Amino acid sequence: MRKLLIIFTIVAAVSCNPSVTEHGTYSDFERVPLKSEIKNVQPMTGIVLWNTNGRSTTAKDKIQLEYSYMLYNDVCKEKDVFDWTPMDKLLEQVASRGHQLVVRFRYTYVGQQCAVPDYIKAWPGYEETSGKSEGRTTYFPDWRCEELQRFHLEFHKRFAERYDKDPRLAFVQTGFGLWAEYHIYDGPCIMGKTFPSHKFQETFYKEMDKYFDETTWSISIDAADAYYSPLNAKKELLDIPFGNFDDSFMHETHHEYNRDCWMFFGEDSYKDGPRGGEFSYYSDYDQKHCLDKEGMYGRTFESQVAEYHMTYILGNDQPGYQSMDRIKEASMSMGYKFEIKDFRVKGNEAAVLITNIGVAPIYRDSYVAVGGVKGEYSLKNLMPGEEVWIHVKGEGVSDQIVPTIECDHLVPGQKIEYKADVI
């Protein structure tokens, strides 16, 4: 699971002692005054709007993330022929606004045709199921079909090969059932047919662990249900690092079923993968009041973000109920947040004491740098409440240069900020 905190950088072993004195760590380095503020929503965090939401353009400085579905049959229509043009265009559009994408792959949507590729629909023995879901005719894939199973794995493999390190992509959501939310709460749910068997799902988890090296993929918290997923029976699958999303966040009884689902994956699962989701649509009241400063149902948004270590949340309707300034403010309570508590320099060496004052880690490698010289310690390992001394040595380091936080997984216009009040 989560690696132990390693704090060796460049050529020196550095201390993680939170109480640094003149007789302690780097006492022979000269402290350099440093002041900085976090003024913006940080990359890869915050409230997410659909890529089609006009506010993604007109208020683009208030958010960092955009959301979209991607349909399997938009990319593949013939066997082993993958046309990624729709995905490339989507990523390009989102990045042009200085944002990154949260994408979800899905087959089934209430009231719509199934997004299984046409060639599979014509496959011998394939029989799609139609049924009523929320009163509308909805189509479900035939998971008995071995070609569908093979395609599903191949799709994610090809996607990872192409986009795993693409800075335009923040997070990937995937799954099965209605909206890929890991349930068919209303409609023809037949395990092994309209919903994949536990055996295939086990294979899927293991293969996904092989496909992705950098991108943190996520599944719904509803996968905690022993009926739908093999995770209860095969607890070792929980050792695979993945994130979760909760698509009814903050509804009235969220502290019951939803919390149980979150805790099933482990109280500290946020250390391995991001926690995200969507504001509840259980009632209009939920959408209208989820970001109210005074909260709803006795809970504020910020308190729930802290409790569940949330990094992002889809809130596409929120511009209709809240100001973009409030949306920005709420977004800034999510995810990681760095503070530099001490900055010391000696010749071409620097020592930076940095802490994570946020509610979650950053899920991509990021590094403290001084004068273009990076420390070796990745801030991806810095959990909330932890702090670490980072030692930097090399040409370019001086007391005239302020530290920066460098990350290769950013699009033009993005910057990781930090708080500092070193005197």
Task: Walk through the language-model features, giving the residues of each.
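Active-site groove signature of glycoside hydrolases
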Residues: 128-194
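N-terminal substrate-binding region of glycoside hydrolase catalytic domains
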Residues: 23-147, 264-267, 271-322
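Extracellular/luminal regions of secreted and cell-surface proteins that mediate adhesion/ECM remodeling
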Residues: 332-423
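Substrate-binding cleft/loops of secretory-pathway carbohydrate-active enzymes
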Residues: 176-274
